[in-house]
Amino acid sequence: MRTINLIIVLCALTLILPSCKHLTELKKIVAVNYHYPPTTGVIDVYQTGQQLPENIIRIGSVVVGESGLTPVKDCTYEVCMRTIEDEARKAGADFIYLVSVQEPDWRGSLCYNITAELYRYKKD
């Protein structure tokens, strides 16, 4: 009987554990409204409250942060910003505007959670 119970538990674990993998990865939500050729080079970053240039179009947004069990090393400010910049390049953005930057907090998440908007300059 113990052997059968052990086999059932092991089978259940082999089915459950792979489905938990997404909980250990950086959460990333990308919404792109307009598609452009990928951008190469430097992507400018505008901080919250900073004046945005004129003649721009918002092409999308990116949210990155903790997904549940994300290791702290995988959701530092640098890792989150690199992820946002990579997504901005794929979408063809010229610059990023940081809407919200939530720093790690001992009462909540130990990871950065960043919301950014992706913009492109209007070409005349």
Where does each model-flagged region fall?
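Short acidic, glycine/proline-enriched helix-loop-strand junctions
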Residues: 57, 66-68, 104-124
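Bacterial Sec signal peptide processing site at the extreme N-terminus
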Residues: 14-36
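Post-signal peptide N-terminal segment of mature Sec-exported envelope proteins
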Residues: 30-51
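Extracellular disulfide-stabilized recognition modules
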Residues: 51-61
